[in-house]
Amino acid sequence: MSDSNASSVARRGFLFRLSQAAAGLAGLAVVPKELAAEPLGAPADVDAWIDRMKGQHRVMLHVHQNFITSLLDSRNLLNNSRDLYGVPEAQYNVAVMTHGPAIQGLLGDDVWRQLALGEYYKVTDKSTNAPAVRNAFLTPIEGEPADATVPELMRRGVTFVVCNVAMRTLSKRLAARGGGEADAIYGQLAAGLVPGTFLVPDLFVSMQRAQKRGVAYLFTDRAH
C-alpha cells in the first residue's frame, strides 16, 4: 500500500470511529455540525478547517491552558486589522487551535454537567460558589468584553479546532476518577462539542499542515 493510500485509510478510520462514538450518544449531546453535515472518510475531511479559511490574511492561535486569551486575541485581531489597517473582516481569517485544558472552552453545557467538568477543571461558578456546571465561555464573562465569547466569534467567522489526542487523554483521566469507561466518556465528549467545532486527529500535525498552506502561527497562551 502506498503512503497516500495508507494515509487515506487512517483518516477514514479516525472519522468512522468518531462518527460511531458520537452517534451512540446522539440523545445526550449534539454532533458537531461540520462533522455531521459532510460525508465522512474523504481525505480532505481532516483539513476542512483549513479549506474554509479563504481570506487574504490567515492565522491560527495556539492555546493550551488559558482559553480566554484565545478569545480576546481573536477579537483583537479582527477589530484591529479592520480599524487600524483597513482590512475587511471577511479577508482576515482566524482559527483557534486547542489542546490540553483549553478544550474545556469548546465543550457544551450538557457535557460540563454530566461529566462534572467544573470539579475536574477546578472552575467555580461565582453565582453559586460551587463547581461550574456550564461552559462560561459561551456567554459574556464578567470583566471581559461582551463579544469575547465562542458563539460571537463563530458568528464573525472564527474557526475553533480541538485535538482528538487531547480528547482521548481527557476521557482516560475522567475514567480514572471513577467517571465511567474511557470509550463511553470519549463518545460523550465528541458528541458534546460546541456545534461548529472541528475535531482533528492531532493538533500539531494539523498546525504543520496549515503552515505548509500559508497559514500563520501565533502562540496565544499566557497568564490572564
Regions found by a protein language model. Name each.
Residues 1-10:
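N-terminal secretory signal peptides
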Residues 56-58, 90-94, 155-159, 215-216:
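Loop/turn elements at helix/coil->beta-strand transitions in domains of secreted/extracellular proteins
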Residues 70-87:
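Histidine-anchored nucleotide/phosphate-binding helix
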Residues 116-139:
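A glycine-rich helix N-cap at a beta->alpha junction
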Residues 65-69, 100-105, 160, 165-170, ...:
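Solvent-exposed loop/turn segments at secondary-structure junctions
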Residues 175-224:
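Glycine-rich, aromatic-bearing surface loops/beta-hairpins
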Residues 87-111:
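Acidic helix-start/capping segments at beta-turn-to-alpha-helix junctions
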Residues 29-57:
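C-terminal segment of N-terminal export signals and the immediately downstream linker at the start
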